[in-house]
Amino acid sequence: MARTSAIDYGRAAKYFLLLDFIKGFGLGMKYFFAPKHTVNYPHEKGPLSPRFRGEHALRRYPNGEERCIACKLCEAVCPAQAITIDAEPREDGSRRTTRYDIDMTKCIYCGFCQEACPVDAIVEGPNFEFSTETREELFYNKDRLLENGARWEAEIARNLELDAPYR
């Protein structure tokens, strides 16, 4: 059997002319000079979805009354057990919360509390910048949650309205 030596000129040309290297370098140069798509974060902020789940808030009715009826559905549905509610009956027979605490160190921002609430009292608002220096600041009480609701009410109401067709 005679062995013939066939030279693959295409493979040899690729090897000696470094075509793969040149292709890779060209691709790198293409992306180097292309316009950048990053956001200069502290100075610019990207758009948020109406369904964005950020910092929690308790809402009030337009007349100032708290929406929460102390049904404790949010406490029951929370997989992280981050919500603690105590309630008392009022003189008119309805129930209202005396204590509404959320341990934000446990919260996984799943949104189940917001979905379970029959009166849209607990919502996850648009704020995602709530870093703290101590862990104690991440234990939200009823007053802090109501304050968040008052601060973000306009945007929360708009987001709930935009999300209404999908609920």
UniProtKB/Swiss-Prot annotation:
The keyword Iron-sulfur applies. GO terms for molecular function: 4 iron, 4 sulfur cluster binding; iron ion binding; NADH:ubiquinone reductase (non-electrogenic) activity; quinone binding. Residues 58-88, 98-127 form the 4Fe-4S ferredoxin-type domain. The keyword Electron transport does not apply. GO terms for biological process: aerobic respiration. It holds the Pfam family Fer4_7. Its cofactor is [4Fe-4S] cluster. Keywords: 4Fe-4S, Cell inner membrane, Cell membrane, Iron, Iron-sulfur, Membrane, Metal-binding, NAD, Quinone, Repeat, Translocase, Ubiquinone. [4Fe-4S] cluster 2 binds at residues 78, 107, 110, 113. It catalyses: a quinone + NADH + 5 H(+)(in) = a quinol + NAD(+) + 4 H(+)(out). PROSITE patterns: 4FE4S_FER_1, 4FE4S_FER_2. Binds 2 [4Fe-4S] clusters per subunit. It is found in: Cell inner membrane. Its EC number is 7.1.1.-. GO terms for cellular component: plasma membrane. [4Fe-4S] cluster 1 binds at residues 68, 71, 74, 117. InterPro entries: 4Fe4S_Fe-S-bd (IPR017896), 4Fe4S_Fe_S_CS (IPR017900), NADH_quinone_OxRdtase_chainI (IPR010226). It is an enzyme of class 7 (translocase). NDH-1 is composed of 14 different subunits. Subunits NuoA, H, J, K, L, M, N constitute the membrane sector of the complex. NDH-1 shuttles electrons from NADH, via FMN and iron-sulfur (Fe-S) centers, to quinones in the respiratory chain. The immediate electron acceptor for the enzyme in this species is believed to be ubiquinone. Couples the redox reaction to proton translocation (for every two electrons transferred, four hydrogen ions are translocated across the cytoplasmic membrane), and thus conserves the redox energy in a proton gradient. Belongs to the complex I 23 kDa subunit family. PANTHER family: NADH DEHYDROGENASE [UBIQUINONE] IRON-SULFUR PROTEIN 8, MITOCHONDRIAL, NADH DEHYDROGENASE UBIQUINONE IRON-SULFUR PROTEIN 8, MITOCHONDRIAL. This is NADH-quinone oxidoreductase subunit I 1.
